[in-house]
Swiss-Prot record:
UniProt entry tagged with the keyword Magnesium: no
Record-annotated Tyr recombinase domain positions: 169-354
First-listed, main subcellular location of the protein, grouped into a coarse class: cytoplasm
Protein name: Tyrosine recombinase XerS
The UniProt record lists the keyword DNA-binding: yes
Pfam families: Phage_int_SAM_1, Phage_integrase
Compartments in which it is found: Cytoplasm
GO cellular component, one term: cytoplasm
Function per UniProt: Site-specific tyrosine recombinase, which acts by catalyzing the cutting and rejoining of the recombining DNA molecules. Essential to convert dimers of the bacterial chromosome into monomers to permit their segregation at cell division.
Domain of life of the organism encoding this protein: Bacteria
Organism: Streptococcus pyogenes serotype M1
PROSITE patterns, A to Z: CB, TYR_RECOMBINASE
Keywords on record: Cell cycle, Cell division, Chromosome partition, Cytoplasm, DNA integration, DNA recombination, DNA-binding
HAMAP family per record: Recomb_XerS
Amino acid sequence: MRRELLLEKIETYKAIMPWYVLDYYQSKLAVPYSFTTLYEYLKEYKRFFDWLMDADLTQAPKIADIDLSTLEHLTKKDLEAFVLYLRERPSLNTYSTKEGLSQTTINRTLSALSSLYKYLTEEVENDQGEPYFYRNVMKKVSTKKKKETLASRAENIKQKLFLGDETLAFLDYVDKEYEQKLSNRAKSSFRKNKERDLAIIALLLASGVRLSEAVNLDLKDVNLNMMIIEVIRKGGKRDSVNVAGFAKGYLESYLAVRQRRYKAEKQDLAFFLTEYRGVPNRMDASSIEKMVGKYSEDFKIRVTPHKLRHTLATRLYDATKSQVLVSHQLGHSSTQVTDLYTHIVNDEQKNALDNL
């Protein structure tokens, strides 16, 4: 979503929220939480407050009037009823064939509520230096996580990675072959953004940064001499990320056309730009997702930018056998999340042995 549109939607949600949610928003903005995260949380709060009103757990006529005492006195049984509502309500819609919200969506909703309750019961201070209330009912609500072994997850992901020679082959395909299948009109659009699109794909494959980190890159954050970029990690921590050398040519080619092609002025700080009616804007996450999906589907299989992150991590582990190095590259504080890549690489090694 374009940044300007995202901020507009955030303001729309803020306009209907209770004062304590606005306090929460301001506090998390200072952490800083990303605007995308805060937008998703505000959507979840609206879903929750709508349910409170529908379930007659508040007498407030509108969301903004729901007071703190309502949240303070909700019981574990109330929250379990909300979870049941999330699981079952879509099936009550006769026009829908869905059986209910996915467990992932439900977990996201509960995570947003847990964050709000933690703020209200632990983090915020009133005039006496105390939190607004002390009873955190969310601590009593358990979440169900999807059960899947690392081996199973590795097998599912492996088919969507561009390992070995496929990394450069994918870039080469976009650079030299993709255009051949296009109509003359489509070729014009492709050529306008070719250098930029290749630079984005190359950066994702060469650094393993998250989509949000790539979107938020500014010109000042990119050092092509050192092949290092500065990003804001989850939790607001600034980090320096090494970029593999194969991306340098693609990034340089994009920079050579960036100003002229996208009408960029001094005030246009974003590294990756799009242009509409002569006005440059930061390229948004949705556009990059669609772009990566389009090219990857034509090359082999449709993937997300996150799979390009997995690709880099797997290739790096295969080359170094160091989970510590991989976790540092990805911006993780623990090596536990990199266990997945050992399984993928071990499977690849087994397949290689079987082919001897």
